[in-house]
């Protein structure tokens, strides 16, 4: 598991947080709070699998700060397939964010689970 982060001070480049969980079934990315400003993050989660038999399927559930945000189960098409989720989340001053991705599969093999959060310009 590898965490990539680029935190910033006010006036510098936007924050970029990423977690490459490899073939893990669960990934958690923690974004610490800022004591000085509110922030908006674009969050992307990608789950990639390889089918090992006919009838393969994959599922991804996303939690933000412990609350289920989204969940989907789909049939795996082709030799490899991905299941992606994208959302935006606004964080007030002092608010942290925990992004958790949980996966399941049938007749498939996990290849990669990746979470990325990129700070966006304000409203």
Identify what each model region corresponds to.
Residues 1-26, 30-35, 105-123:
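C-terminal interaction-tip segments
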Residues 13-19, 68-78:
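Solvent-exposed serine/threonine-rich low-complexity stretches and specific carbohydrate-binding patches
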Residues 27-33, 81-89:
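Exposed aromatic-hydrophobic patches
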Residues 32, 44-50:
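Short edge beta-strand/loop segments characteristic of extracellular beta-sandwich folds
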Residues 36-39, 51-56, 107:
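A short beta-turn/strand-edge loop motif at beta-sheet boundaries
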Residues 38-43, 88-112, 120:
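Noncatalytic modules at the cell exterior or secretory-pathway interfaces
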Residues 46-48, 63, 70:
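Short, charge-rich amphipathic interface segments used for partner binding and complex assembly
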Residues 53-68:
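Short, surface-exposed beta-strand/strand-loop-strand elements in extracellular ectodomains
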């Amino acid at each position: 598991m590898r965490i990539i982060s680029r935190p910033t001070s006010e006036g510098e480049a936007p924050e970029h947080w990423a977690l490459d969980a490899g073939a893990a079934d669960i990934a958690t990315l923690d974004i610490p709070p800022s004591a000085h400003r509110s922030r908006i993050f674009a969050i992307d989660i990608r789950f990639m699998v390889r089918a090992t038999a006919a009838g393969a399927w994959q599922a991804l559930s996303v939690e933000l700060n412990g609350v289920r945000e989204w969940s989907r189960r789909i049939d795996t098409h082709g030799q490899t397939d991905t299941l992606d989720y994208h959302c935006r989340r606004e964080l007030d001053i002092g608010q942290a964010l925990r992004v958790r991705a949980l996966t399941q599969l049938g007749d498939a093999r996990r290849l990669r689970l990746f979470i990325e959060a990129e700070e966006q310009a304000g409203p």
